[in-house]
């Protein structure tokens, strides 16, 4: 399978992220859902040839989800013993890999201070379950992603935010979007791809005007739309991938109007 890479007409987005990575700075990718933040992190992982350990944040995220947990293990002699299973944070630190924290502002603020020492010059933490002091191996880097203003998100603690350098990641469009659709979906029909790109421009305009939510204009939704367009009429593909996800009837009607204009 061909490895897809992050693309953006603003080349400084990736160039700056790579430069910050090489300086061992914590990177906070900030942008709307589906704008390619995870793809950018994955591309950095591939370019730097470092594996990536991912944490998916939610209100249910706890210290065990970050650091790991104790469990009972049967050793080679057949005796049971209590062992600690490393979680993504500790794995990344010990191996000198990348730690990617997705939707970091979905986590409860009281869950994240355990990472303060990981994110500052110390690059270390004390495992509260074992007492072990863990210092990050060379190569360890932290990338986090944030979606601001969405349901379920919480204001990011200023002390935590100050440990990162922010890079804005906006939606892609135009020729770059055409290339992404061709590379990441099954759709290869140039004319239909052009119509989808124009349709996306209308969605983004409506998003900026507050007529529809940003989720409706996500790159992820467009890739799904393009895939479905190879097996069903484009109108039904839009219905399945975008319209049916929306609760507001006015948003649904606005997108139906955009379909009539573009297809």
From Swiss-Prot:
CDD domains per UniProt: AAA
Transmembrane intervals: none
Gene3D superfamilies reported in the protein's UniProt record: P-loop containing nucleotide triphosphate hydrolases
Annotated ATP binding sites: 31-38
UniProt key word Ligase: no
InterPro entries: AAA+_ATPase, ATPase_dyneun-rel_AAA, CbbQ/NirQ/NorQ/GpvN, CbbQ_C, ClpA/B, P-loop_NTPase
Superkingdom field: Bacteria
Recorded GO MF terms: ATP binding; ATP hydrolysis activity
Keywords in alphabetical order: ATP-binding, Nucleotide-binding
Protein family according to the UniProt entry: Belongs to the CbbQ/NirQ/NorQ/GpvN family.
Name of protein: Uncharacterized protein SE_1092
Species of provenance: Staphylococcus epidermidis (strain ATCC 12228 / FDA PCI 1200)
Lineage, broadest ranks: Bacteria, Bacillati, Bacillota, Bacilli, Bacillales
């Amino acid at each position: 399978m061909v490895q897809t890479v992050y693309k953006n007409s603003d080349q400084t987005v990736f160039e700056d992220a790579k430069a910050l990575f090489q300086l061992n700075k914590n990177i906070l990718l900030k942008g709307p859902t589906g704008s390619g933040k995870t793809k950018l992190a994955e591309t950095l992982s591939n370019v730097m040839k470092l594996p990536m350990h991912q944490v998916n944040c939610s209100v249910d995220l706890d210290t065990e989800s970050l650091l790991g947990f104790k469990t009972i293990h049967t050793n080679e002699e057949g005796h049971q013993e209590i062992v600690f299973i490393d979680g993504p944070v500790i794995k990344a630190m010990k191996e000198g890999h990348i730690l990617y924290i997705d939707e970091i502002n979905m986590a409860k603020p009281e869950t994240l201070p355990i990472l303060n020492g990981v994110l500052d010059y110390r690059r270390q933490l004390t495992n509260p379950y074992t007492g072990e002091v863990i210092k990050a191996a060379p190569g360890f880097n932290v990338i986090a992603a944030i979606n601001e203003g969405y349901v379920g998100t919480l204001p990011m603690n200023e002390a935590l935010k100050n440990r990162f350098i922010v890079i804005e990641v906006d939606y892609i469009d135009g020729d770059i979007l055409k290339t992404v659709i061709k590379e990441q979906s099954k759709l290869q029909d140039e004319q239909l791809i052009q119509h989808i790109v124009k349709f996306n421009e209308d969605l983004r305009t409506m998003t900026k005007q507050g007529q529809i939510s940003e989720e409706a204009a996500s790159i992820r939704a467009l890739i799904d739309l393009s895939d479905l367009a190879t097996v069903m009429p484009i109108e039904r593909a839009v219905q399945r991938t975008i319209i049916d996800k929306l609760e507001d009837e006015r948003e649904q009607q606005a997108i139906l109007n955009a379909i009539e204009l573009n297809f």
